């Protein structure tokens, strides 16, 4: 399903849905969004998720931003995101680090730092 719907992300950013495809095998919508943010930084994942929820009527816990790519200085970002039918499917398919990233939590990397090792 090809679509050109507009999505208002913030006062300084607006997006256009370039591709909205239903993947019935997995149970999700796969959306490609082009975001125009001239003169401002790349919109946050949370802002993009909120805008998609308002525009498409989904739930926040079912939306995952897969990728945001911005060319330096261009003011245009390409966003890939998925909207799932259920949280169970989302948790089976998407990597945990993406779920943590969209939730705004940071994972601690393994290993200890800060004087624990023997220094000479």
Swiss-Prot record:
Q: Which UniProt keywords apply?
A: Ribonucleoprotein, Ribosomal protein
PROSITE patterns, sorted: RIBOSOMAL_S24E
* Cited InterPro entries: eRP_eS24_sf, Ribosomal_eS24, Ribosomal_eS24_CS, Ribosomal_uL23/eL15/eS24_sf
Q: Where is this region: Disordered?
A: 101-120
- One GO CC term, this protein: ribonucleoprotein complex
Q: Which Pfam families match?
A: Ribosomal_S24e (PF01282)
Keyword Nucleotide-binding included in the entry's annotation: no
State any GO BP term from the record: translation
Citing just one GO molecular function, the answer is: structural constituent of ribosome
Q: Which family does it belong to?
A: Belongs to the eukaryotic ribosomal protein eS24 family.
For this protein, the record's PANTHER family field holds: 40S RIBOSOMAL PROTEIN S24
Protein known as: Small ribosomal subunit protein eS24
């Amino acid at each position: 399903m090809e679509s050109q719907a507009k999505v208002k992300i913030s006062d300084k950013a607006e997006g256009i849905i370039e591709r909205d495809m239903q993947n019935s095998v997995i149970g999700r919508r796969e959306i490609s969004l082009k975001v125009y943010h001239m003169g401002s930084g790349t919109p946050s994942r949370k802002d993009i998720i909120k805008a998609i929820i308002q525009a498409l009527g989904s739930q926040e816990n079912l939306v995952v931003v897969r990728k945001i790519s911005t060319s330096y200085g261009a003011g245009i970002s390409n966003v890939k995101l998925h909207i799932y039918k259920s949280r169970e499917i989302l948790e089976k398919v998407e990597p945990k680090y993406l779920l943590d990233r969209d939730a705004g939590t940071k994972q601690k990397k393994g290993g200890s730092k800060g004087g624990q090792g023997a220094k000479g």
